[in-house]
Every structure is written in structure tokens, then in C-alpha cells.
């Protein structure tokens, strides 16, 4: 079954072709980062308009890469949420228009399920069950995964997501959008031990996260250095390192607890922040001590992309799930409300 995957949840237009037998055939991505950088963040209206301009040309580009025609497509998967509603509607509308014209099934899939399943595109995919850390600009969640659509929420952020905290810290330090990679790059120049930031909610039981207090602590540290006239580039790097270390340590501590509580030996990390080198190294060291394994997608599939949507959609479309005539766009959508892949669905995955 040849599936076209479409991702338009935020500021990246992603398209991919996935074959159920041969795997990923082609993928392409257009990033709007340059357009939004002048505004210090994503402008929803501009994002939607750019998706309109770029989506169909990207579809044709991917088909050409794979040597396929539109008539070869046997199903279409698109991101139905969570995300910016206007951006989601662009992807959903194009997917359903193509599906209607070609007479093939269409399904709106969950953006974070796509991230969660992205490591399945690698040569050594994880087996079920596993614990997943979903960590991005909008989400920080720990989930027990027993199968596709079989999700138990173990913990999540009660306020800011880790990726959001990275972006806000970048602004405090005068760095450009997107903040996460720039904070990480600056942290590489930092000196160990110059600052010690708190590891929020690690001094109590449970698997929930909170990063708003850490964000405030960072702001106070930056302002204190400004007041003293010491906020030079080296001090900024020291602060970036202390902040990154605090986030990474917090995530590692919670992941260890989740593995110990569930008895799972496999940990999947997914989402944009999963590309962070310090986080990967720290989680691998922790898992090795527990005689476990860590799985993640290649860096290009950590951020938003069409390949993960094509893969996630393929698993559900093969099982007979589809939207029918309903275009689905859900800005907020808890992942643990998704139905199992074996449950019959002819009117979308959202009740």
C-alpha cells in the first residue's frame, strides 16, 4: 500500500511517500523558519498561507523522486492535530481533495503519534512495549506504549513544555528563533560549574514535569548578570549550559523512574528536543546502567516531517481506518484518546 503523508501542523511543510512493503521511498520538507525569524516566533496566518503555496509542489516533487504518479497513491495521511488550526486545515483540505479525485481513503492522524512512531523508520526499530519521552516545543510527556493506539499517560508537563523553555531562554540570551538548537550550540562554549540551576519536580514522587519555574530562574540569572554588567558572551554560554543541564537532568531522572516503575527496558525519545546531543548521551548512559536500550529517529526526522505522518497513517489505513468525508482539524488532542489500530473507524480518529 503506497501512502502519501502530509505534515502542516505548524511552520514546516512536509510530504513523504511510504510503501508498506518497501518502506520510505521519498520525502521533502520546506521550513518557514527564515520567514518567522523576523517575528521571533511563528505567525499562524503567515504559516497557513505558506503551506498553501508550498504543499502541492512538494507533493509533485516527492512523486518525481520516487518515480511515481498521483494515480499510484493508494491512501493519504495528513496531520489532523494538535497544531495551528489554519495550518491543519490546509493539509486536511489538500489531502481530502486529492483523495476524492483519486477515489482513495484518507485519514487524519495525530501529530505526536507520528513523532512517537518516527523511530520505526530506522533499521533497528523498538519492539512493544516501551516507554516514550515525547519532548518538543508544545509537549513534554512520558507514555507507556503497548501498541499503536495503546497509550497510557505516565506524566506530562503541568505548564511549559521543555522545548518552549528552550525557546524562551534563547530570547533571554538574545538568540534567534528557533531557540532550542541555538541554546544547545551556545551551551557547548559554556564552563561547567559556573551556575547551578534547579531540577524542577525531581525532589518529589511522580512523573509530571514543570519548566515555568526554571524559566523564571533563568530570567532572574540573566537580569542579575545584566545589573552587574557581567553579561558578556562567555556568561551567556555559562547560563545556556546550566539551563540545558537542568532540563536534561530533569528529563533523565523522570525517564529512569518511568522505566523502573513500568519494568520496561526500552525507551523511545521523540520530538524536536530529542535531537539534543546532551540529552541523547545522558539517556543512553542512564539506560545502559539499567541494562536497557534507547531508540530515536535520525535528526532530520526528530523535527516535524512528512515521513512520520506517512508511516503512522500507513499503519492505520492498512487496518481499514479512515476519515470518510470528514476533514479533521483538532488544535488540542490528547494522544491517549486515540483508538487502537484494530478498532474499526470510518469517520476519523476523533470522537
Curated annotation (Swiss-Prot):
Q: Name one GO biological process term.
A: tRNA threonylcarbamoyladenosine modification
Question: Where substrate is bound, by residue?
Answer: 134-138, 167, 180, 276
Stored Gene3D superfamilies: 3.30.420.40
Gene Ontology CC: cytoplasm
Predominant location: cytoplasm
Subcellular localization: Cytoplasm
GO MF entry, a single one = iron ion binding
Any one Pfam family here would be: TsaD
Q: Where does Fe cation bind?
A: 111, 115, 304
EC number from the UniProt entry: 2.3.1.234
Keyword Acyltransferase part of the UniProt annotation: yes
- Per the UniProt entry, the disulfide pairs are none
Report the superkingdom from the record.
Bacteria
Q: How is the cofactor bound?
A: Binds 1 Fe(2+) ion per subunit.
Which reaction(s) are listed as its catalytic activity?
L-threonylcarbamoyladenylate + adenosine(37) in tRNA = N(6)-L-threonylcarbamoyladenosine(37) in tRNA + AMP + H(+)
> Which keywords label this protein?
Acyltransferase, Cytoplasm, Iron, Metal-binding, Transferase, tRNA processing
Task: Return the InterPro entries for the record.
Answer: ATPase_NBD (IPR043129), Gcp-like_dom (IPR000905), KAE1/TsaD (IPR017861), TsaD (IPR022450)
Which coenzyme or cofactor does it need? Fe(2+)
Family classification: Belongs to the KAE1 / TsaD family.
Q: What does this protein do?
A: Required for the formation of a threonylcarbamoyl group on adenosine at position 37 (t(6)A37) in tRNAs that read codons beginning with adenine. Is involved in the transfer of the threonylcarbamoyl moiety of threonylcarbamoyl-AMP (TC-AMP) to the N6 group of A37, together with TsaE and TsaB. TsaD likely plays a direct catalytic role in this reaction.
- What's the protein name? tRNA N6-adenosine threonylcarbamoyltransferase
